[in-house]
């Protein structure tokens, strides 16, 4: 008996709970529609569309629910789904002509002007209003513009094609056909911004493609130097996580951008040589960037290149300009005006003639080859482009002094050495010239004095630096007036004085009489 009670108790409880609580209630169609209406009003279009779908399952003949679901679909941009719902409405209730008008509007935006005209005619058979007349006019304009755009494309009239396809797209902005037509014509014109905008719209209209996001990421990174490149690659990988082309582009851009960020950080911190180290070399940032840019201009797997040749990628690449400008700045700030720095700065100037660092580099290099007036113009250009920066003013003043100096004494020319000659070369040149300048061998005291004056300046590190900066230590009108012969920090290889006697110190004497210069090796 006790066992029977233990078994019976759960059964009794279940029976009581069913009587008390009842079966789980199932919402009625009216309740579902009421909830869907609330969601639609709140802007929760996806949830509203699902709710209307549930109501339609309960009552497939209620065309009002199709209409409201179509409204939700339109708000979500699901135009094809909305078209299907409006078509279903007409099957249920052919007299509901408003569905024809809605289909006409959708088809017009899709660029299907002929079908839109058909739907609009079905609407105006029973009802005509100003909105329908306006739509009819727009469809006529759109059809004519599309026809003209196609004709212009066939004749290679790219600008005309762009103008007419633009007019047609004003009526049918969601038309992939018209959008691609304008892309083709704008590409021929090299209009990168228009192409980028249209490709972005096409990618949103067809998110299942991988080529468009790849093309967009390459344009965004190489041409526009935009952070949007990463977003486009994510779209590509979102659709196909295993896509090899998407992974390859992602890896390349990530590697380049990582090193570019390091270069920017080094330049900002003043460690210019470290920045140059990353930029330079066969595996340096600039070489890898140029290779990646070149790859983007080549067709792949039977598809067009990501960057059309009409874009002139090397000339118009903002990222290329940014990287070469960084390289130019690093070389200028490191006072590196050799061939490498010159190449970087000249490339920068070829893309942007208003880059300040490239003009500084050109000016400094012109100074080194003694083209004083050209150098003066270059550094003055940099000064003006910089907004008369006080950081550049010393370079202008230096060029001015050197230009003035060039019209006076040139100690390097006196010794016959280049401006970058080292101490040993200067001493050797002086000794050689002194043998020829001595009065006993056809020279003169004036020539010998000029040699001594030149050597005194160029053999002294401090005096030479002043002279190289345009301040002649022997010029009484210079910035620092003093007698450069008051000290011999650089060391004269000869000490001379007026006396009779031979020309000593060389392995062989020079015959002759009269006043002699006596030289003694240091």
Swiss-Prot record:
Disruption phenotype: Leads to hypersensitivity to endoplasmic reticulum (ER) stress caused by the N-glycosylation inhibitor tunicamycin. Markedly impairs the elaboration of virulence factors such as the polysaccharide capsule and extracellular urease activity, when induced at 37 degrees Celsius corresponsing to the human body temperature. Also impairs induction of the cytokines IL-6, IL-10, and MCP-1 in the lungs of mice and attenuates virulence in an intranasal murine model of cryptococcosis. Residues 1-22 form the signal peptide. Pfam families: DnaJ, TPR_1. It is found in: Endoplasmic reticulum lumen. PROSITE patterns: DNAJ_2, TPR, TPR_REGION. Residues 465-494 are annotated as: Disordered. InterPro entries: DnaJ_C3_Co-chaperones (IPR051727), DnaJ_domain (IPR001623), J_dom_sf (IPR036869), TPR-like_helical_dom_sf (IPR011990), TPR_rpt (IPR019734). One of its GO terms (biological process) is protein folding in endoplasmic reticulum. GO terms for cellular component: endoplasmic reticulum lumen. The TPR repeats mediate interaction with unfolded polypeptides and the J-domain is essential to stimulate the ATPase activity of the chaperone and to increase its substrate affinity during the folding cycle. This is Tetratricopeptide repeat and J domain-containing co-chaperone DNJ1. It comes from Cryptococcus neoformans var. grubii serotype A (strain H99 / ATCC 208821 / CBS 10515 / FGSC 9487).
